[in-house]
Amino acid sequence: IEFDIYRNNKHIGKHIFSFEKIENKTIVRSLIDFKISKLGVTLYKYNAEGVETYLDGNLVNFTSSTDQNGKKKYVNIKVQDDEYLIDGSSYKGSAPIEFLIGTWWNHSIVKAPAQISAVSGRVIKQKVTFLGKEKLNLDGKSYNTLHFNFSSNDKKLNKDKKLNTDIWYEEETLNWVKASFKKKGNWEYRLTLID
């Protein structure tokens, strides 16, 4: 699955997922790479790599490393005694296994009481609102979608830590096709390839 990343309607990078199935194990690799430039000068660079490992459909391991404009962040998660053990740059501790990694491709996240940041391991309690069905045109293709908003339950969080993201899933397949959020500009992830 490939997404183009846009900031203020300008293409700045890519988010690519690959899926590998080996018997009852599924490995999901994710790569995000973008940069913000002005007049040929790079102002901000972002690169993240993550690997999710599932056994019989259940997450058993997750690792990620992120370079956020020179600031290093990471997450390592494993399952022990029916809970997640998280070692992340923002959170170290445990979390219930009904929480999901915030990588968006897994539609089940709409039912999760919280998501775990794929960048830092921070646990984000979430409220999910179904906003309706919409027809979207992306990269020359038309999709019938289900539109959701994900927001933070914790009203005490400062503004740049709050979750407020719109996600669109294709109605028939439940594949993720678009994301939209505001953070120092208007951001969109738009599906370009699904294989």
Language-model segments: which ranges?
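Acidic, serine/threonine-rich low-complexity disordered tracts
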Residues: 1-79, 101-195
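Acidic/charged, solvent-exposed loop-and-adjacent secondary-structure segments enriched in E/D, K/R, S/T
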Residues: 82-100
